[in-house]
A protein has these predicted regions:
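Exposed loop/turn and edge beta-strand positions of beta-sandwich/beta-sheet ligand-binding modules
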Residues: 13, 79, 104, 154-157
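Auxiliary Fe-S-binding modules of radical SAM enzymes
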Residues: 1-91, 248-256, 262-351
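A generic beta-sheet turn/junction motif
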Residues: 76, 88, 99-101, 199, ...
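Conserved AdoMet/S-adenosylmethionine-binding subsite of the radical SAM
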Residues: 145-320, 324
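Short linear Ser/Thr-Pro motifs
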Residues: 75, 109-110, 123, 196, ...
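A short loop-to-beta-strand scaffold at the N-terminal edge of the catalytic core in hydrolase folds
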Residues: 92-97
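Canonical Radical SAM [4Fe-4S] cluster-binding loop centered on the CxxxCxxC motif
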Residues: 99-136, 142
Length: 351
């Protein structure tokens, strides 16, 4: 049975290649092709002999080469590309490439589906099927990086904001981020990495203890207990007041500002009173607020508030000296909400 090479450390790669009959120095060459040049086929590694390539192809697989793109959507401005990737076991996740003036970001999933049950999210419609491995998280990045290297560019930022709760797959997520930080991979700064959580406090505490300057984003979406429970059942186990306290400990240890994400849902959590409640909880905190007008999710029945309502909410926060912005629209014309592309594909397969 062939062994998977993608996502291994250089030492692990050396051990496998030597055991297969290759010279030890070949591991460094393969490593460079995989993680610096984003080549995911052995026969494209031009400084390897035909005999070495034959050994590699006979004994090993490369995960990115096995991924199947089930669906792909590109925004009209060509700045956002969203794909539904199928893994060899038949499970699929969404991942997104976003082109910015300042670089190229990839939004990755950490689980197949999600168990958090957030009312506004399509990712949890079928629950969490399984965690992704670190290699599967990395493969999402390298699928897009292989496209960018042909343009002389590379992925410069990663946000763990796709399907799944990253803090419930902590080791794999951190393993993938640490891998990308290595000098012989993408050498990505931790300051260009963001983990978004719905508020799993033990995970926030573990991240604090690591002491890495990774950006932390908290999915808040309501600052009133009953409403947050309605929107995010996780609030029953981890009340948002305690989540904010854990986030402040993270700030104190790392010096990094925490971002609070707040999806504005028409008639639900978008009133001036809701804005005042949010400001009361975040005042004097080392925090910023990212307001996100809701992407309509047909399965949930939620709608986007008007521009006037969004601006009124923003003004309340600014009045209280809260650093707040409205997320720039980059993919309104595609299935942008988390889980929508996967849910749409699943529905098509049933019809």
């Amino acid at each position: 049975m062939k062994k998977e090479l993608f996502g291994l450390s250089l030492i692990e790669l050396q051990e496998l290649l030597v055991a297969a009959g290759l010279k030890k120095f070949r591991a460094a060459q393969v490593y460079q092709w995989l993680y610096q040049k984003s080549v995911t086929a052995f026969d494209q590694m031009r400084n390897l002999s035909k005999a070495d390539i034959a050994i590699l192809e006979a004994n090993f697989t490369l995960l990115p080469q096995q991924l199947k793109i089930l669906r792909e959507q590109v925004s009209q401005d060509d700045l956002t590309r969203k794909v539904l990737l199928e893994f060899p076991d038949g499970n699929s996740v969404e991942t997104v490439l976003m082109r910015h003036d300042y670089g190229y970001s990839v939004c990755v999933s950490s689980q197949v589906g999600c168990d958090m049950g957030c009312a506004f999210c399509a990712s949890g419609l079928s629950g969490c099927i399984r965690n992704l491995t670190a290699a599967e998280i990395l493969a999402q990045v390298y699928i897009f990086n292989s496209m960018l290297v042909r343009e002389g560019k590379q992925v410069s930022r990663i946000v763990v904001m796709g399907s799944g709760e990253p803090m419930l797959n902590f080791d794999a997520v951190i393993g993938a981020l640490q891998f990308l930080h290595q000098e012989n991979t993408l050498y990505m700064s931790y300051r260009n990495m963001t983990i978004s959580t719905c508020g799993i406090i033990p995970g926030i505490e573990k991240l604090t203890q690591l002491g890495l300057p990774i950006n932390l984003a908290i999915s808040l979406h309501a600052a009133e207990p009953e409403l947050r429970i309605e929107l995010m059942p996780v609030n029953k186990g981890f009340p948002f007041q305690d989540v904010i306290q854990a986030a402040e400990a993270y700030v104190g240890y790392t010096g990094r500002q925490v971002t609070y994400e707040y999806i504005l849902i028409a008639g639900k959590n978008d009133s001036p009173v809701a804005a005042e409640l949010l400001a009361n909880h975040l005042r004097f905190k080392h925090a910023s607020v990212n307001l996100i007008p809701a992407n309509p999710v047909p399965e949930k029945g939620f709608e986007r508030p008007s521009k006037k309502v969004v601006e009124a909410f923003l003004k309340v926060l600014q009045k209280h000296k809260i650093n707040a912005t409205v997320r720039r629209e980059m993919c309104k014309d595609i299935d942008a909400a988390c889980g929508q592309l996967r849910a749409r594909f699943a529905q098509e397969q049933q019809d």
